[in-house]
């Protein structure tokens, strides 16, 4: 309802279906960054899934440091007497991205935090996001070395 009020729209089924893209959503947490894109590709290859919008916050992180791949897709939902399209938000991220986003949300949106302090801590939060991204890349590199059989000597 907040989103409808903010957009000054009536509280009707039509207004919701036409203007609210995240009435339904799912978060997919993957082990590795490359898995995110593989999962997205598999989803979008389904003949009953239509891509409406794609926001790649992995390749283009938010200023806060937030990383995730967001897809708005349209999928069929089956009601008692009909099949209707529904917009669904799909968020795909790694375990590290999910860890950071969960903790950042808890810290940033706590009540009674001084705005000035929060602004100063934002630099630390972005630094943590960057370190988290480095960890993702390092773990993916290790996985690829294992897959190629190059786990010998000083390869690490």
What annotation goes with each model-predicted range?
Residues 7, 23, 33-36, 74-77, ...:
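Surface-exposed peri-terminal alpha-helical interaction modules
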Residues 25-29:
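Short aromatic/hydrophobic contact patches that present stacked aromatics
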Residues 17, 30-139:
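Long beta-strand-rich cores associated with HINT superfamily self-processing modules
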Residues 1-24:
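A glycine-rich, hydrophobic loop/mini-helix early in the fold
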Residues 6, 45, 109, 141, ...:
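A structural signal for alpha-helix termini and helix-coil/disorder junctions
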Residues 135-156:
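Intrinsically disordered, low-complexity acidic/polar and Pro/Ser/Thr-rich regulatory regions
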């Amino acid at each position: 309802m907040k989103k409808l009020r903010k957009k000054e729209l009536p509280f009707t089924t039509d207004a919701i279906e036409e203007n609210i893209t995240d009435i339904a959503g799912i978060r997919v947490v993957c082990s590795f960054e490359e898995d995110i894109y593989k999962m997205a590709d598999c989803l979008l290859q389904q003949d009953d899934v239509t891509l409406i919008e794609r926001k790649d916050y992995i390749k283009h992180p938010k200023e806060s440091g937030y990383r995730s791949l967001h897809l708005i897709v349209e999928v069929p939902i089956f009601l008692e007497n009909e099949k209707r399209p529904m917009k669904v938000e799909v968020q795909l991220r790694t375990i590290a991205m999910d860890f950071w986003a969960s903790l950042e949300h808890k810290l940033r949106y706590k009540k009674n935090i001084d705005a000035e302090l929060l602004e100063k801590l934002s630099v630390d939060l972005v630094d943590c996001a960057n370190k988290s991204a480095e960890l993702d890349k390092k773990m993916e590199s290790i996985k690829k070395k294992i897959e190629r059989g190059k786990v010998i000597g000083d390869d690490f």
